[in-house]
C-alpha cells in the first residue's frame, strides 16, 4: 500500500480541556491534511501525570467527535512509548551526547532560559538528575509556511536542553521528535508558541538521521493581557452545543472564507466546506491574535 504524501497530526495535552485556541490549532491541522487527501492522526501527549486533569483525555476525544473531527487509525498515547524514549536517551548518554545535570531552578534563573553548561563535563550519575543533550554552536533555520524564515543559534539562545526531567519524566522536545518520525508525520501544523522549540527539534532530527517535516505555525489565540488561552488562565472549555458557530469563528481566525449559510449547517458540513475552500496562504502572518478581535 502506497504511503500517503501527507500525514498530519493533532497532539493535545490532557492538562485541561480543549478551548478555543485548541480548536483553531486542531482545525488548521485537520483542514491542511484533508484538503490534499492526507491522513490526520491523533496523539495524546500525556507525558506529565502530575499535571493531567482527571477525565481530560475522555473529554478531549468526546469534544473532537462532537465537533466533527475524524482521525485515522488508533490514537497513540505517549505514556505507552517510554521504552522508545529510554532507548534513544541511553544511546546518547553512552556516547557522551547527553549528560546528567543536577542544577536547581534557583541556580539557573539568572540565565533567562539559556543553560550555562555548569554540569556539561561534571560526569554526574544519571540517577536523581535531569538529562540534557549537548547542542552545537550552530544556527538552525527553517522555512515556516506561514511565519516565514525562522532561525535560532542553539548555543547562544538555548544551550543544552533537558530531554528527561529529574523526576524521570521525558521532555516534550524528545518525545515529539521520536513520535512524529515513528508515525511517519510529514507535516506539522501547530501553534506559534512552539516556533522556538522547532530548531531544537531540527537538531534532534539531525542526530537521529530523520527527514525534516514541513512546518506551519498558526497564530496563537491570546487573552487581552497577552497570555495564551489555556487551563492556567481558566479559559472556558469548548461547549458541546456550540460546534457550528465556534468552528466558523475558528475559520475566521485562520483567515478562511466563511459562507453565511454555514451558520445553519452541522459541524460536519462546516468541516466539509472548510476542506473544499482551505487556503493556508490566507492564514494571518502573525504570532498572536487576541481572541476578542475575532468576529
Swiss-Prot record:
Its cofactor is Zn(2+). A motif ('KMSKS' region) lies at residues 228-232. It is an enzyme of class 6 (ligase). Gene3D superfamilies: HUPs. GO terms for cellular component: cytosol. HAMAP family: Glu_Q_tRNA_synth. This is Glutamyl-Q tRNA(Asp) synthetase.
Amino acid at each position: 500500500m502506497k504511503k500517503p504524501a501527507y500525514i498530519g497530526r493533532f497532539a493535545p495535552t490532557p492538562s485541561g480541556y480543549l478551548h478555543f485556541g485548541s480548536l483553531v490549532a486542531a482545525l488548521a491541522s485537520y483542514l491542511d491534511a484533508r484538503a490534499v487527501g492526507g491522513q490526520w492522526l491523533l496523539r495524546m501527549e500525556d507525558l506529565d501525570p502530575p499535571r493531567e486533569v482527571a477525565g481530560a483525555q475522555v473529554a478531549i476525544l468526546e469534544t473532537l467527535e462532537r465537533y466533527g473531527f475524524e482521525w485515522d487509525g488508533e490514537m497513540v498515547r505517549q505514556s505507552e512509548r517510554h521504552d522508545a524514549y529510554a532507548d534513544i536517551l541511553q544511546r546518547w548518554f553512552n556516547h557522551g551526547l547527553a549528560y546528567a545535570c543536577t542544577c536547581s531552578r534557583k541556580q539557573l534563573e539568572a540565565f533567562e532560559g539559556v543553560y550555562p553548561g555548569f554540569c556539561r563535563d561534571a560526569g554526574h550519575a544519571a540517577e536523581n538528575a535531569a538529562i540534557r543533550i549537548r547542542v552545537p554552536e550552530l544556527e538552525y533555520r527553517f522555512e515556516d509556511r506561514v511565519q516565514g524564515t525562522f532561525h535560532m543559534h542553539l548555543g547562544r539562545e538555548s544551550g543544552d536542553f533537558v530531554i528527561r526531567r529529574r523526576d524521570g519524566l521525558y521532555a516534550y522536545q524528545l518525545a515529539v521528535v521520536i513520535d512524529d518520525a515513528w508515525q511517519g508525520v510529514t507535516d506539522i501544523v501547530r501553534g506559534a508558541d512552539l516556533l522556538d522549540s522547532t530548531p531544537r527539534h531540527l537538531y534532534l532530527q539531525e542526530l537521529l538521521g530523520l527527514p525534516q517535516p514541513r512546518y506551519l505555525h498558526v497564530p496563537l489565540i491570546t487573552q487581552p493581557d497577552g497570555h495564551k488561552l489555556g487551563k492556567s488562565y481558566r479559559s472556558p472549555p469548548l461547549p458541546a452545543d456550540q460546534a457550528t458557530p465556534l468552528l466558523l469563528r475558528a475559520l475566521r481566525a485562520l483567515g478562511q472564507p466563511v459562507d453565511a449559510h454555514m451558520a445553519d449547517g452541522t459541524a460536519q458540513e462546516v468541516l466539509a466546506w472548510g476542506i473544499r475552500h482551505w487556503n493556508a496562504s490566507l492564514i494571518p502572518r502573525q504570532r498572536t491574535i487576541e481572541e476578542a478581535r475575532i468576529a
